[in-house]
Every structure is written in C-alpha cells, then in structure tokens.
Amino acid sequence: MTILSAITSISRPNKISKSVISSNGGASLSMGSNSVSCFNACGGGSSYSYSSSYSGSGLDYSYKANYSSSTGYNSSVVIASSTCHCS
C-alpha cells in the first residue's frame, strides 16, 4: 500500500488499477484499498470524485461515487479500474 500510495501521488488525476473485488453477492464493491489510495493521492482530508469502469463478456459496468472525509462513500457494481479526481 505504501508503494501504491507513493506511485499514485505523483500525478493528478490518478489512475488506479485493481482486480475485481465484490462483496454482498456482487451487489456492491469493497472499495477500501482504492479509497485509501485515492485519499492519500489527494493529500488526505480532501474531497474527491471517484469514477470507474469495467468491460468484460460483452457487459459494461460503470461506477461513480463522491467521497468526503466527513460523510464517507457508497459503492455499487463491479469494477476493474478507476480514476481519482482531486478537488
């Protein structure tokens, strides 16, 4: 995680690749490590928008969430790659 955070903090917006990780029967996605990486890449404590997409077997999935240090975030659908936009 330290290495990933260091790499993703080099430029903004940040591209973070991650294997598909689903929870709750695939209805939602565990965004823990990506969220931490995005949080660190944005300098910590900042708000950011987090968007992701995944294509496989002819199906396209999209994911978008807004995060703030005070309200947290919600997640849905399975994704494979994502981009952080610091604000």
Swiss-Prot record:
GO biological process: sorocarp development
Pfam families on file: Coiled
InterPro entries (alphabetical): HssA/B-like_chaperone, HssA/B-related
Assigned protein family: Belongs to the hssA/B family.
Official protein name in the record: HssA/B-like protein 56
